[in-house]
From Swiss-Prot:
This is Voltage-gated potassium channel regulatory subunit KCNG2. Belongs to the potassium channel family. G (TC 1.A.1.2) subfamily. Kv6.2/KCNG2 sub-subfamily. It is a multi-pass membrane protein. It comes from the Eukaryota. InterPro entries: BTB/POZ_dom (IPR000210), Ion_trans_dom (IPR005821), K_chnl_volt-dep_Kv (IPR003968), K_chnl_volt-dep_Kv6 (IPR003969), SKP1/BTB/POZ_sf (IPR011333), T1-type_BTB (IPR003131), VG_K_chnl (IPR028325), Volt_channel_dom_sf (IPR027359). Keywords: Cell membrane, Ion channel, Ion transport, Membrane, Potassium, Potassium channel, Potassium transport, Transmembrane, Transmembrane helix, Transport, Voltage-gated channel. It comes from Rattus norvegicus (Rat). SMART domains: BTB (SM00225). Pfam families: BTB_2, Ion_trans. GO terms for biological process: action potential; potassium ion transmembrane transport; protein homooligomerization; regulation of potassium ion transport. One of its GO terms (cellular component) is voltage-gated potassium channel complex. Residues 370-381, 382-389 dip into the membrane without crossing it. The gene is Kcng2. Residues 1-187, 253-263, 318-332, 426-480 are cytoplasmic.
Amino acid sequence: MARLPGHPEVPGAEPGSAVRGGRGGRGARARHVIINVGGCRVRLAWAALARCPLARLERLRACRGHDELLRVCDDYDVSRDEFFFDRSPCAFRAIVALLRAGKLRLLRGPCALAFRDELAYWGIDEARLERCCLRRLRRREEEAAEARATPPARGPQTSPGRALGSGRLERGRRRLRDVVENPHSGLAGKLFAYVSVAFVAVTAVGLCLSTMPDVRAEEERGECSTKCRNLFVLETVCVAWFSFEFLLRSLQAESKCAFLRTPLAIIDILAILPFYVSLLAGLAAGPTGSKMLERAGLVLRLLRALRVLYVMRLARHSLGLRSLGLTVRRCAREFGLLLLFLCVAMALFAPLVHLAERELGAHRDFSSVPASYWWAVISMTTVGYGDMVPRSLPGQVVALSSILSGILLMAFPVTSIFHTFSRSYSELKEQQQRAASPEPVLREDSTRDDSTRSASATEDSSQDPETAGAAGSLPGPVGP
């Protein structure tokens, strides 16, 4: 790097005289400064900085020596009298607009968080942003904080240290992970996903058929017809496949405890376990244990009703369902606000309609305030079953107010929930596309190959004068 020309520090000298020395008129250099930010050269007047001071440039003006100057900027060109800053030129254009027009706006190009860091670097308060731009920055900060708080989704990729494993067990686990977790990895992954979805559909059909009146009548009489036996065989085959799939997913997981704590693994356990519990209970009771089965019949039926959770397994293969689950996790605060709004409105309109109908109108539909809570919830959600209808004029006025307030209260958090769903869907779709794109396999000898190729390329370029001349003509940073 070119050094500054020597300027002895004179007591009482003007601040920045060591920086503004050199060829040319001293008065012109005292009035202007040339700033180069990432290739964007701007000539600024010190008077503009006085109107809207930048902390870093003010420190630059007060510099008196070379070492002090390098603590403020990244480089200094003596021939051009130019100060170089290795920062974002896009963000600096917005700062130049602030100096010239007095308005600071958030540009569409750079990231809002990166722009905030640039403002902190140049010493500009975020409050100088225009109101609309400041709202955009705050919203982006909330999204970033929310993304940091949300645990990352487990994908099919492994850590780099695991990916470099050369053992046969690690390679087999990697292939198994691609098959069961990444349907886009190949033909085996697609077939596994299709078979899993098909078994979920068959289980849903079998669950519907098992609730038919004739099948229920046979179960209550203790009989087992051909239809009942076929449904049992169908359920057994499906549960066997789901158990096999659960075993494969647990084998490919790096941490078994972390895998068992995932929501989909908990759903699998709750859906599979009732079948084995009822089967073991039937085998333990034997042919003479009918009374014990009768006492445990209600519990077993409730456990077998958990088979409906098999439908939630579709979330493994549906991008929309996974986006919905991520949205529910991220919008817990919005759902809490919605519940709070409904509870407050319900506590307000239920006593009013009870007073209007029971006390003033003498109608018996609204027998108590707790019974009126049901009517308030149904009315505010615009469902309207019609089982409880206000018939007096005051009651109808209360009903109209309840319906209108319900429409407004439901609409408040919906916009935020919709935007969160759109963002979650875009993130998961991008993650799925990255997982589907082929990645190069890392090998142990890749480092040696790269170093060999780099050495050969260096030798070739040193022997070829044209290549060396072209390389020497490339611009580079100013060095000391």
